[in-house]
From Swiss-Prot:
Fourteen ClpP subunits assemble into 2 heptameric rings which stack back to back to give a disk-like structure with a central cavity, resembling the structure of eukaryotic proteasomes. The gene is clpP2. It comes from Desulfitobacterium hafniense (strain Y51). Its EC number is 3.4.21.92. It comes from the Bacteria. NCBIfam families: clpP, PRK00277.1, PRK12553.1. GO terms for biological process: protein quality control for misfolded or incompletely synthesized proteins. This is ATP-dependent Clp protease proteolytic subunit 2.
Amino acid sequence: MSYLVPMVIEQTNRGERSYDIYSRLLKDRIIFLGGPVTDDVANLVVAQMLFLEAEDPEKDIFLYINSPGGSISAGMAIYDTMQYIRADVHTICVGLAASMGAFLLTAGAKGKRQALPNAEILIHQPLIGGGGISGQATEIEIHAKHLLRVKERMNRILAERTGQTIERIEADTDRDRYMTAEEAKEYGLIDEVLEKPNQPKK
């Protein structure tokens, strides 16, 4: 099901200009990752990061995440780009950051990984997509070995990003592990739970 993307109108000294909401947010260095992490989505996110990096490598990029996860290779393309560019990527979870969504949430710059109070974070081991594996025994063995290598690499990165031991990460990702925003902070997946900003006194 497709949704209508809202348009916003901005007044400039040259008259009115209309943007779709995501393009307008991009002007403020905000990227929104909403939905599954697919190759197409990853390409868009990477392209936006590279554009913002070229515009100003000293300014933070804000990546808002509300995602059930998705493709490992697509997610790793986003992860590697986040580490490659000079601009700090500030990650914020709104709603849900599950699986690869949680991995990208914790990949933000240290001290700049946040979640809203009612957000949920889910970590687990890498899954095989497509409803199962079929093929020759040797091909299944190749896929299984590859998945174990991917699992080991992702666990190592999670351990580095959270400060947890590899053994703890392996145990906690063996099955689905849901966390509240506060629990994710205690675990080291994020640095801060965002509360309402201070309101000016009347």
